[in-house]
Amino acid sequence: MVTVVAETLTKESFEEYGTIISPDEEISRMQNLEKGANQGTAIKLLQVSQVENKSTSKVPNWNLFRCFPQPHLNRVFTQGSNQAISHSIKVLEKHPCSTQTFVPMGRTSAEVAYLVVVAKEIGNKPDLSTLRAFTCLGNQAVTYGLGTWHAPMIVLGKEEHLDFSVLIYESLDPDRPEKDCVEEHYSDGDVCIII
């Protein structure tokens, strides 16, 4: 059995697994907050996340996921509070040929909205010794690095659902689905996250 305690998502904590888009974190690091974009009505943050493609597809897809919280996760979560809620991970997946970016829609920067679970790879399988979990705010997006193992989206909070717009390159070859997604399954309780 592997158990990991979820931590707060930051650029540094996630960098081994991909990149994040975190506007408040990016803006807090800027020297010059001049609104130099859109005729002075916006701050432009450049190159906040990397997109990679090793698939045969030359055009990325925008997909939409409407995700629902599991009953035990349908409650208010706050950053930094250890509420000791246990969540079992039953599958990790990877996309061997593309990064995958999840952009949450409709939640605020004050809300813990979802949980991200990631692991590095060893021998074409998830290396559970590198497993980490992160609580994400409603205005933080994640880009899983090329081939990074991750759990499907895990929604937190009292809202009925959370929508994600998702950017990925996919071949959509019905004869070779493993080119787009590979899964590793676990029994209930084998891999647990404490939120």
Swiss-Prot record:
One of its GO terms (biological process) is purine nucleobase metabolic process. InterPro entries: RmlC_Cupin_sf, UAH_cupin, Ureidogly_lyase, Ureidoglycolate_lyase_dom_sf. Keywords: Lyase, Purine metabolism. CDD domains: cupin_UAH. It catalyses: (S)-ureidoglycolate = urea + glyoxylate. Disulfide bonds: none annotated. Pathway: Nitrogen metabolism; (S)-allantoin degradation. One of its GO terms (molecular function) is ureidoglycolate hydrolase activity. Optimum pH is 7.3. GO terms for cellular component: membrane. The keyword Lyase applies. Its EC number is 4.3.2.3. The keyword Lyase applies. It is an enzyme of class 4 (lyase). Induction: Subject to nitrogen catabolite repression. Belongs to the ureidoglycolate lyase family. Catalyzes the catabolism of the allantoin degradation intermediate (S)-ureidoglycolate, generating urea and glyoxylate. Involved in the utilization of allantoin as secondary nitrogen source when primary sources are limiting. Homodimer. This is Ureidoglycolate lyase.
